[in-house]
Amino acid sequence: MEKNLYRIAGCNEAGKTTASFTILPEILNCKEFVNADEIAKGISPFQPEKVSFEAGRIMLNRINELLNSNQNFAFETTLATKTYKSKILNAQKKGYNVTLLFFWLQNVDLAIERVRIRVLEGGHNIENEIIKRRYINGIKNLFNIYIPIVNEILIFDNSEAKHQLIAEKLNQTEINILDSIKFNQIKNYFYESEK
């Protein structure tokens, strides 16, 4: 039986969690979803940002448990750090097929605005500078690290109400670009960050 690891990625408020609750159980038949934000809410529902470090540690431990027990699972990340590269390579050595689902927003201002709305609705805040840093680093790591190493990737524009597939890489093939204008927009952010 094939083992699957799904990495749900994108900047803050790109719609990762919302999409995960539909895509994972209903389409991919994946019942294990590890999410540091949800863990933090479980520890401190009214101030989850105060326990983010502890939630991250619990998340890493849970990922290790799932890998060691050869279970299908997914986890959420902004891709802003290189932390999970070794986890992905380790999973592949253990026979996992690793799929990255990347949810992109057309600009960082949209991410900032969505976080602002989330706060007005009672959600946790993230400073604008952190959102900007994660947005750029996520795109940079997408191209520098993760596109080359994952088995499969789906890149979506999630700026509007309905997400749109921009590019895909299936079964270790070359990346197939379905919307070259939007894919080039993402690459332009990457090239700008490399200067």
Provide a role label for each language-model segment:
Residues 54-105, 138, 154:
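Glycine-rich phosphate-binding loop used to anchor ATP phosphates in small-molecule kinases
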Residues 20-71:
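Conserved substrate/cofactor phosphate-moiety recognition/catalytic segment
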Residues 11:
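P-loop (Walker A) phosphate-binding loop of NTP-binding proteins
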Residues 14:
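ATP-binding Walker
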Residues 144-195:
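NTP-dependent small-molecule kinase module
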